[in-house]
Structure formats: structure tokens, C-alpha cells
């Protein structure tokens, strides 16, 4: 793993260049590396191992998030977007829920848009493989005293209203219920790509260029040739070139189209962007909920699933909620 200050050359080369180390890029690059391919990952953010994670919200959001936690999307309404920017990407800061694409959505893609080969039957084996790789389970919530009390309250309320609840499939192994999912799991229980796919890729010979921001893809006649990236050398910005035979751009729904547009590779990139809104409701209870003992949304209300609405709890620390 190359970090800021490690870049001693102006030019690098590889067979496969993968831009992004989150949920998309890490899987693609790992599978290629394990097939014997020469793979280089590029990550704009820094490399922060599990041992560096602490319980300080301000410190960890500054390290793991783009713009220290909040990127405002200007429009009506004004939306606060949270993006991961570190080795492991958004998987390091998400809530470890891992959902299969619903069958009704896959059916819609096939029936309304003619997208063949992506039926539930086609994808089920792939879903199962990823779930095995990430130790996914959705059994129950912790029975330990004063743990996940927010989710217990959600279940109690749903029962009174006769609403359907489901346990969330979680990519976690031996969860210690520190409720630090959103600022980096300090125990390594959450199976982010930082602790799951990327170590496999490195073991297979892949390299990771961290603190390395791709600014442009150089291409001609429909073929991409090399990437121009910015790194820090002796406290100054320095440009390097990475040549490749094959390119995977996996910078997420925001950064991927942004890079494609900057590189004049696509006029339509980003025009069909959609994202789900999180609407927060804050509740006060007469008894303690112990936000430090639990994990993010192990249970959801699925009563309104067909209306594209889930309800879950997130007993985050006050300093994180303030964001």
C-alpha cells in the first residue's frame, strides 16, 4: 500500500487499473488479482487500519469522510450527502446492512426495460457467494443487557401497530456492539472491504495507491490509455501517470460520473442520478437507551416495503447526530 510521501516515480503501469476501493472496485479488483492479473487500486482517501480507529467522532469523520462528513447538494431541497473517502470507501462508514436486490425490482428491470440475465434466479448464486465472503447473517439482536434498546423499542411499537418487522442481514463477524459503525468499526467485526476483500487482493499481489486522486483519464478513438493523478510529495502536489491495459472506474454514484465528465468520456454521465433520502425523527425516552451499546439498525419495519419505505432506528452518539 503506497501512502502520501511514498510516490518516488512519475509513471507507473499495470494490467488492470481499478479506481476506487469501496463496494464495487474492491470486489472487481480482488477477483482479477486472484485470477493472476496485475492489479493496481487507486484511492483518493488515506489508508487507516482498524487499529487506528477511535471513538472520537470529529477525528474519524475528518479521516474517513469526504469534506469531514458533509457534502451539501445545492438545490431544492438542500441535501446533506455523506461519502466515504478512505481505503475501503463507503463500506468503512456504513451500517453493515447487506441487502439483496428485491425480486420485484429485478422483475421490473426485465419486464419494463428488457434487461435480461439479471433475474433473481440468475443472481442468487452471486448473492450467496458475497454473503459467505462477508459472513452475512440476520438472526436476531443481542440479548445482552441494555444492548440495542432502540431496536427493542422499535419492535415493541411495531407489534402494537401490527406492522411487519425483519431482521437486517448484517456483514459482521463477532460484533462487539460498540455502535461505532459510522466512524469505523474499532474491533474489525464489520466486514468492510478494508478487512475482507482488500486483504485478499493484496495477498494475491495487488497494489493500492492511497492518497492518490485521479483527475483525468486520457483516451483517444474510444480507448483509454492512462490516468493522471495527484499525490503529495514533500508536502507539495505532484502529478503522476498510471498506464493500463484495462480500466475499472468504481468511484461511486457521485465521483464516477464526475470523473467521466471531466475526462470528456461521457456527456450523459450522472444525468439519471437517484438516491434514497433519510428522513430523521428524534425520540426522547424516559429511560436510558444506551446508544454506546448496540449497532446500527439490526431490525427494520418492512410494512411499507412496496412503497419504497423502510423504518429503522439509529441510536447514534449526540456528536454524530449533530452533523
Task: Please place each PLM-identified region on the residue numbering.
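N-terminal FAD cofactor-binding segment of flavoenzymes
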Residues: 37, 44-93, 101-104, 151-155
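Rossmann-like flavin
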Residues: 87-174
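N-terminal Rossmann-like FAD-binding beta1-loop-alpha1 element of flavoenzymes
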Residues: 15-41
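FAD cofactor-binding and catalytic pocket of flavoenzymes
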Residues: 94, 266-323
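Conserved beta-strand-loop-beta-strand element in the redox core of flavoprotein oxidoreductases
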Residues: 216-241, 247
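A conserved beta-strand/loop element that lines the FAD pocket in flavoprotein oxidoreductases
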Residues: 202-214
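Extreme N-terminal leader/targeting segments of oxidoreductases
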Residues: 1-16, 34-35, 75
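Short hydrophobic core segments
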Residues: 16-19, 42, 241-254, 259
Amino acid at each position: 500500500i503506497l501512502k502520501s510521501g511514498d510516490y518516488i516515480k512519475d509513471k507507473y503501469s499495470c494490467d488492470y487499473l481499478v479506481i476506487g476501493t469501496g463496494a464495487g472496485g474492491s470486489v472487481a479488483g480482488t477477483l482479477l488479482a486472484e485470477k493472476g492479473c496485475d492489479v493496481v487500486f487507486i484511492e483518493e482517501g488515506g489508508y487507516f487500519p482498524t487499529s487506528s480507529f477511535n471513538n472520537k467522532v470529529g477525528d474519524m469523520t475528518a479521516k474517513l469522510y469526504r469534506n469531514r462528513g458533509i457534502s451539501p447538494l445545492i438545490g431544492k431541497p438542500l441535501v446533506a450527502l455523506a461519502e466515504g473517502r478512505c481505503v475501503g470507501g463507503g463500506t468503512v462508514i456504513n451500517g453493515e446492512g447487506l441487502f439483496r436486490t428485491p425480486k420485484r425490482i429485478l422483475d421490473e428491470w426485465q419486464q419494463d426495460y428488457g434487461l435480461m440475465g439479471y433475474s433473481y434466479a440468475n443472481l442468487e448464486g452471486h448473492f450467496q457467494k458475497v454473503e459467505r465472503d462477508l459472513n452475512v447473517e440476520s438472526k436476531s439482536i443481542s440479548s445482552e443487557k441494555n444492548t440495542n434498546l432502540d431496536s427493542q423499542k422499535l419492535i415493541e411499537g411495531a407489534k402494537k401497530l401490527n406492522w411487519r418487522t425483519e431482521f437486517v442481514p448484517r456483514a459482521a463477524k463477532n460484533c462487539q456492539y460498540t455502535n461505532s459503525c459510522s466512524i469505523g468499526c474499532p474491533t474489525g467485526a464489520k466486514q468492510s472491504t478494508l478487512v475482507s476483500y482488500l486483504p485478499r487482493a493484496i495477498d494475491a499481489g495487488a497494489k493500492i495507491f492511497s492518497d492518490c486522486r485521479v483527475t483525468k483519464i486520457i483516451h483517444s478513438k474510444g480507448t483509454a490509455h492512462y490516468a493522471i493523478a495527484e499525490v503529495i510529495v514533500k508536502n507539495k502536489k505532484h502529478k503522476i501517470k498510471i498506464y493500463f491495459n484495462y480500466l475499472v472506474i468504481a468511484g461511486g454514484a457521485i465521483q464516477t460520473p464526475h470523473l467521466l465528465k471531466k475526462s470528456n468520456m461521457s456527456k450523459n454521465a450522472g444525468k439519471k442520478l437517484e438516491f434514497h433520502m433519510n428522513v430523521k425523527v428524534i425520540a426522547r425516552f424516559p429511560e436510558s437507551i444506551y446508544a454506546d451499546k448496540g449497532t446500527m439498525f439490526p431490525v427494520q419495519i418492512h410494512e411499507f416495503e412496496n412503497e419504497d419505505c423502510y423504518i429503522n432506528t439509529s441510536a447514534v452518539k449526540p456528536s454524530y447526530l449533530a452533523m
